[in-house]
Amino acid sequence: MCHDVEGRFLHEPTVAALEAAADAAEADGIAAVFVTTGPLGDAVTLAAGLSATTSTILLGIRTNLSTEPHRHPTVLAREMTTFDLISGGRSLLAFTPPFSDAVIEAIELCRAMWREGVAASDGPNYPVAGAINRPQPRRPGGPPIAVDLTDGTQADPLLIAVADLLLVSTDSPAPDGLAGLELCRIRPT
């Protein structure tokens, strides 16, 4: 999917500029673009809008659980399911630093929602009982989950073990010990 190919983070000042940047990235053969919740609004909503103006590029959401505490992982999983359906299965979900046990717990809850359609946890960070996710994502098992290491952060091996892919900067070598894990190199902006 993203093995040693280029992706881009989009930090555009307007929705029109964001759409133009995504269209240009797709035309240039870039594998993926990523948006973050910020001044333009919610990243999932923005990416869903970008899916209407693009057709092949993967559309990634970057989320930071420490700065978005209102977004419970079961809510995020449902939002990502809807986005995956709207985008035709072109969605990605990337978790950004700081990393903690809460991120692993969030990934486990998202995956349960996507794979079983229901999630329950008595974990310390996100206790929940009977959260339901219907319909299921277009992509079996749900969107791929990335760990964003583009700032040079070292991730816990347990976190790397639950990720589908890693986002690393083109400025730095790939971390050691990642056999079998997909890498998506991101050009710094």
Enumerate the language-model features and the residues they cover.
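Active-site-adjacent structural elements that line small-molecule/cofactor binding pockets in enzymes
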Residues: 1-189
